[in-house]
């Protein structure tokens, strides 16, 4: 799966919103990749480009060696989007059987039901299911065509904690077959626990791309915070080890990859007031990367693409 220089703008010329702003993204066969970003960052639009639901204004999109539309038409891609809902007045089994019949090489119905974890209520009508159960049926629909790639847009947004855990158990079982998974989420722990790789999108651009550890390291491995007490904020980014600076009110937060050197310099400058040092988390890195003063892109090495 490859996007090259993909751009998508919505609205009138000269007054539009650029939802995707020159994205370059390659996803290898068998990878599980999370798209992470704030609301409106461009995650859903990127997914729509990969599914052929929208066309880029410029740039190219290739999926499994062909156009996105052909990959979907050939039954190679399954999708679970935020909008839409399954047909209501049929049983779960009837729906999955119907969807499977529209594909050239579908997954056996019983297998799709089992993998999605809906076998226990396969003979119930869909309009009698809970919200969490309906969400799992949508997953079974995405599996029905036996796709090599499955794309999920905020798949666990309507699920409680236990239902989310069960869903990801099913997803990992699908991925272990050598299939490729791309999912968007705003749950940081979900991305960290279930993805081989995390792609952070902000304002339509990729600002970080790598493992959870890579993302954490991009904003410094430690956090040093202290009270400014009316002191100047200029030059904090020049302190030893500092890779990003956040100032909120009268308190500064420094992302640093050498907290000892940073603290020593603050002490030399007599700037230690209510100082705290802690290890950076994925959330800290995410907030730093998607702040107005975002860090430059961080990427891992090249990969075989699908």
Model regions: which residues?
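Solvent-exposed beta-strand sheet faces enriched in polar/charged residues
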Residues: 4, 64, 227, 248, ...
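C-terminal coupling/interaction segments
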Residues: 257-306
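Hydrophobic side chains in well-ordered alpha-helices
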Residues: 73, 211, 235-236, 262-266
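Non-catalytic surface loops within mature trypsin-like serine protease
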Residues: 12, 29, 120, 228-230, ...
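ABC transporter nucleotide-binding domains
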Residues: 1, 8-183, 188-196, 200-202, ...
């Amino acid at each position: 799966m490859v996007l090259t220089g993909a751009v998508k703008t919505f609205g009138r010329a000269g007054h539009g919103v650029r939802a995707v702003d020159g994205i370059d993204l390659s996803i290898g066969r068998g990878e599980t990749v999370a798209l992470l970003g704030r609301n409106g960052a461009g995650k859903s639009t990127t997914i729509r480009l990969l599914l052929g639901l929208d066309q880029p204004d410029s740039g190219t999109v290739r999926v499994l060696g062909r156009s996105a539309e052909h990959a979907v038409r050939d039954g190679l891609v399954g999708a679970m989007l935020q909008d839409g809902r399954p047909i209501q007045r049929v049983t779960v089994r009837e729906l999955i059987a119907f969807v499977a019949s529209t594909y050239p090489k579908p997954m056996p119905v019983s297998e799709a039901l089992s993998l999605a974890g809906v076998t226990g209520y396969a003979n119930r009508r869909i309009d009698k299911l809970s919200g969490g159960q309906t969400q799992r049926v949508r997953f079974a629909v995405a599996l029905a065509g036996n796709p090599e790639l499955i794309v999920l847009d905020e798949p666990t947004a309507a699920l409680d904690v236990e239902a989310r855990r069960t869903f990801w158990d099913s997803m990992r079982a699908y991925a272990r077959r050598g299939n490729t998974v791309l999912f968007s989420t705003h749950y940081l722990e979900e991305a960290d626990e279930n993805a081989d790789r995390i792609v952070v999108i902000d304002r339509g651009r990729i600002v970080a791309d790598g493992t959870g550890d890579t993302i954490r390291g991009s904003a410094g491995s430690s956090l040093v915070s202290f009270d400014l007490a009316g002191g100047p904020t200029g030059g904090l980014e020049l302190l030893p080890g500092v890779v990003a600076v956040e100032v909120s009110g009268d308190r500064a937060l420094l992302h640093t990859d050498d907290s000892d050197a940073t603290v020593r310099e603050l002490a030399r400058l007599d700037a230690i007031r209510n100082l705290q040092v802690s290890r950076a988390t994925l959330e800290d890195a995410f907030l730093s990367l998607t702040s107005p003063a975002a860090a430059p892109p961080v990427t891992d090495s090249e990969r075989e693409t699908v």
